[in-house]
Amino acid sequence: RGFQNSLLNDAQNKLKETLNYMETSMDMNLDTIDAVINELNYRQEFPYFLDEKNVLSEKEQIYFVSSMQEELINIRYLYPNKFYYGAVFSSNNQIKEKYERQYSLEDLKNKPYYNEIIAEKDNISYGMVRNSEFKSSNINIENLNLDKSVIQVLPTYLKVYNLSTRQIVGVIEVDMEITKLVGEDNLPVMGNNVDYLLLDQNNKLIYQTGT
């Protein structure tokens, strides 16, 4: 019995250590997401460029696209292989033809998860974990023999308002893969037939290692 108790205690300690690691990893990654989206908000003039009421000159359009591309390059450099995708949803569609990551705000409003964005009073909010609707590459993979598996992401949203009317004129979305969020690459190996499970607030399974 003493040997059994020792094994049980070892297992409990290892489990506690692993759960602490997952919690710490998620906290650190959430802090990283907040830092990135706040930096974007600080550096970019989103209320001006995303508002459909503003007619942008060709020079302004080029400036915005170049500035966003530079920011994303900086993010990749500072946080390599950390984020899955970043998207700009705008009521101003002038830039959409020039920037592959810009989409119409009206398209976002038609999504079933748009209500979860506007329901939050804070400018920055986390969405429910869901399958990504974006490809991390602009390459068309439909006819290529590449992995097309579903990518689960935690989306984080920044609402952009008209400074006078307080109407939403745009939304910035930053996605992190759920595997990156929990730090899957560094999770301790618990042994055969043992998986890690992560549930949301509704007890819905959103992440599982192994099978």
Model-predicted segments: where are they?
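Juxtamembrane extracytoplasmic/periplasmic/luminal helical "stalk" adjacent to the first N-terminal
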Residues: 1-55
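Amphipathic coiled-coil signal-relay and dimerization helices
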Residues: 48-50, 89-101, 203-210
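Short hydrophobic alpha-helical segments used for membrane anchoring or interfacial signaling
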Residues: 42, 85-93, 195-203
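Extracytoplasmic/periplasmic ligand-binding sensor regions of membrane-associated signaling proteins
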Residues: 77-83, 87-175
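Second-shell loop/turn segments in exported
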Residues: 21-23, 55-62, 101-107, 114
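Solvent-exposed, extracytoplasmic
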Residues: 68-76, 112, 148, 161, ...
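Juxtamembrane extramembrane loops of integral membrane proteins
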Residues: 38, 42, 53-64, 73-79
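N-terminal sensory and localization modules of signal-transduction and trafficking proteins
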Residues: 6, 10-14, 126-132, 171, ...
